[in-house]
Amino acid sequence: MPVLAHSDCRPPFVLWNGHVQTVYPVLFRPVPTVSPARERIATADGDFLDLDWHQAVGRGPARLAVISHGLEGHARKKYVAGMARALTRRGWDVLAWNFRGCGGEPNRLLRCYHSGDTADLHAVLTHGLGRRSYADAVLVGFSIGGNQLLKYLGEDPERVPRAVRAAVAFSVPCDLAGSARVLARPANRFYMEYFLRSLRAKARLKNRLFGGILDLDGLDAMTTFDAFDDRFTAPLHGFAGAADYYRRASSLPHLEAIRVPTLLINALDDPFLSPSCFPAEAAAASRQLVLETPVSGGHVGFVERNRDNLYWSERRAAAFLAAAA
């Protein structure tokens, strides 16, 4: 499928910068008005997942959209709420789910979530489909939620329910090692520290809850994902180390196997992404994957001003899903 380099994403001139696009929505976007209903489901390994349900506006055929958030995010982040609002207006019931430990309460197990964990996404999707016998479903993911989504669709296409008609993923670090290297640069220290502050707090909490089982020596001195993932994320989730984790959890090797219409949107000025996160060759070889590369948009930014109070990402996702599903 084509690589769409001439995107119609045109942010306001004053926001024509990847860093500004990334930070502006976090600081200044009003929280979209949504009132989801929360549901808790059990996982097969004795843990739980918290789901937020948003009901479609108006009457029509029952259709389900599942939204996956980004690293250390949650289902009520502004970008999730904005997407949920856009899709419910188009007649989709929306299920926005929280990764383990991201719903406001620690999960029960020592393990948490990771960037390539597709089992929980599959569990959420199958639960959602069964709740109302939805005939049609679509997937939307942001950042590592997008990586999970793409990996899920491609690693075992036979496992994906037939009801899944299309998918959209934004700002995806589909090569996790490349993204980790980019974020380790001095220019991105602000973002790295933002995430590590949250991850360190979770490591300390897990250590207290599980009787001091973790080695926290040097935790505060860790300044990169590589160091944190090598000590915590990788061993807690069955990987040999950070390098093994990044290799096995990345969606990049699975993109050509995707069998449903899928739109991957990565802005060229995204400060989180390496060149390897723009998989033009995989898109060209795929019959289903479209890669769109707006000149600007930052990381999960895509700010746009319009009378509907929607961001460009929300309009683009709604239009693609309507056409593909």
Regions found by a protein language model. Name each.
Residues 18-58, 303-305:
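N-terminal cap/lid segment of alpha/beta-hydrolase-fold proteins
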Residues 62-70:
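Short beta-strand element of the alpha/beta-hydrolase
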Residues 76, 84-108:
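Conserved alpha/beta-hydrolase
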